[in-house]
A protein has these predicted regions:
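Acidic, low-complexity mobile loops and tails
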Residues: 1-56, 93-126
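Short, glycine/small-residue-enriched coil/turn segments at secondary-structure junctions
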Residues: 2-4, 66-73
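Conserved hydrophobic positions within beta-strands
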Residues: 14, 60, 69, 74-77
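Residue-level recognition of beta-strand microenvironments
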Residues: 17-19, 63, 80
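Short, Lys/Arg- and Gly-enriched loop/turn segments at beta-strand edges
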Residues: 59-70, 87-89
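Short, charge-rich, low-complexity interaction segments located
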Residues: 77-80, 85-93
Length: 126
């Protein structure tokens, strides 16, 4: 079973958000990295780009497939995880430590449409 962490918010497209104050750290879940296999490239937006909940903001490529990244929240990108540009495989080592973007949240009600750890675990078991 893939690792799921309590206190995070999860989307049906297998992205997570870790909220700290007015900011959200967005990445792919352990379930997603397991399904993708060895990650070889992460396409990320630029700092100051706007992301919109439910819309694409980048992609993750692995040796098996490419997968669009769908933002679970809306806001402004304030930081990207630059380490992933040179070492994208860190996502496979720990998807939750190796977030992709940090977003200044523009509408925290976006979180109401996401799953908690229990709901996400059940979703993945379907």
């Amino acid at each position: 079973m893939a690792k799921v962490i309590e206190g995070l918010y999860y989307s049906e497209s297998h992205e997570y958000v870790r909220v700290e104050g007015d900011f959200g750290f967005v990445g792919i879940t352990d379930y997603a990295q397991n399904a993708l296999g060895n990650v070889v490239y992460v396409d990320m937006p630029e700092v100051d780009d706007e992301v919109v909940a439910g819309e694409e903001f980048g992609a993750v490529e692995s040796v098996k497939a490419a997968s669009d990244l769908i933002s679970p929240v809306s806001g402004t990108v304030v930081e990207i995880n630059e380490v992933l540009e040179d070492t994208p495989e860190l996502i496979n080592q720990d998807a939750f430590e190796n977030w992709i973007i940090k977003v200044e949240l523009s509408d925290k009600s976006d979180l109401d449409h996401l799953m908690d750890a229990t709901a996400y675990t059940a979703f993945c078991e379907k």
